[in-house]
Amino acid sequence: QEQVDTICEKAAMAVSKMRIPLAKMANEETGYGIVVDKITKNQYASEHIWNYMRTAKTCGIIEENPAAGTKRVASPKGVIAAIVPTTNPTSTTIYKILIALKTRNSIIVSPHPNAVNCTIEAARIMRNAAIEAGLPENVISWVSVPSLEISDVMMKKVDLIIATGGEAMVHAAYSSGTPALGVGPGNCNAIIDETADLRMAVESIIHSKTFDNGMICATEQHITVLNSVYK
């Protein structure tokens, strides 16, 4: 566990140090979002997510019940396919690699065709730092020339898919025959009722929708205001 956590921390801190150039690179390559907000997302995906999961035990016996005579032992799943979108390319790459490293899985990053360079650069930074900390060389890899055909073949050959993207991509992941975790287009509804602080609600929704120009799929897409509140 100690070796795994050391590798994760080195990778997380290395990519966090490059959060600014990665944010600029993502913005310039995709034409999406706001640089300063992408910096925040990169920092969150690296430092905050690592700090959240750093104490989790992912090696050996993780749970034991002497009364029942049972033990739960953590083991790697195998090879993970990480499908990365053009909207949040670097931050998505960062947290998916951290998940793979923490759980001792190999990962293949498949960039969106419009975000190849920034996605690969984020993965390269993390791979180099992880290798220096003791990770075998080919645990982190990527698709240099992505295509639908390559993604389709890859999703059928790996052990787990973590797909983030459009509806068609997520549907393809779920239909591949491989276990998949998918995050597709958001349809988040904000309901404002009598208990709401109206000023706070409005400010929160505006901030959410304008952060990185609304690139995050969890931003509000629809607002429902009860008749008792609407004026």
Residue spans for each PLM region:
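Aldehyde/semialdehyde dehydrogenase
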Residues: 5-13, 20, 24, 147-160, ...
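A structured beta-alpha segment of the ubiquitous adenosine-cofactor-binding alpha/beta core
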Residues: 59-72, 140-158
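Solvent-exposed alpha-helices and their adjacent loops that cap or buttress functional pockets
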Residues: 70-77, 100-101, 132-136, 152-156, ...
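ALDH superfamily catalytic-core signature
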Residues: 94, 102, 170-231
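Conserved small-residue-rich beta-alpha loop and adjacent elements
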Residues: 54-129, 133, 176-178, 187, ...
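N-terminal Rossmann-like NAD(P)+-binding subdomain of aldehyde/semialdehyde dehydrogenases
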Residues: 1-70
